[in-house]
Amino acid sequence: MRMSTGIVCGGLLALCVSCTEYTPKPRGYFRIEPPAPSYQALPVGDLPYTFRLSRWAEVELPPVGNPAGWINLSYPQLNVKLYCSYFPITPATLGRAEEECRALVVRQSKYPERIKMQAYSNPEASVYGSLFMLDGESASPLQFMLTDSVSHFFRGALYYDCIPNADSLAPVTRYLKQDIVE
């Protein structure tokens, strides 16, 4: 009796352990810890604009021959770059500049109806704009435009230097949204 119980238990154990069907494991991602926000004045003085810049961002001036006022802000530890472009405008060309910006935003999204827009207004400084947040697996989840409606138009687009995965990049996107709003 004892021996048959041992054989039955051993047989059941062998059946449970000898399973040959592969069970896939979920893919793991590294935890991304953005640094604490800290800001300084833009260290480039010959631009037609100024703003506060994260201490973690590196300013890259484009090669000679690119339009004046264009800069890139690189976050090497986050593998992200913010491409910024500047255009002198007139009140007559403001509408066209805004429409081009919106068209570029829509082109980046698979689902244009999911684009969220947040308006920005600082009447004391005469600065107005929009922040566009793209849902899903977009390579450029944040884009923005700023203008004084008279002579300056500034546009920025954030790009990841990796395959976008909105869930795993969400902490970085939140951090950079805070930097852009600052």
Model-predicted segments: where are they?
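A general structural signal for short secondary-structure boundary/capping elements
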Residues: 87, 131, 178-181
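Residue-level recognition of well-ordered beta-strand positions that form the cores
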Residues: 85, 157-159
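Sec-dependent bacterial lipoprotein signal peptides
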Residues: 1-19
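Signature of long, low-cysteine stretches enriched in small and polar/charged residues
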Residues: 102-155
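Broad, structure-driven detector of short, well-ordered beta-strand segments within folded domains
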Residues: 82-84, 142-143
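Terminal, regulation- and interaction-focused segments at domain boundaries
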Residues: 40, 85-88
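N-terminal targeting sequences that direct proteins away from the cytosol to non-cytosolic compartments
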Residues: 19-80, 92-95, 100, 114-115, ...
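Short, intrinsically disordered/low-complexity patches at protein termini
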Residues: 16, 105-107, 177-179
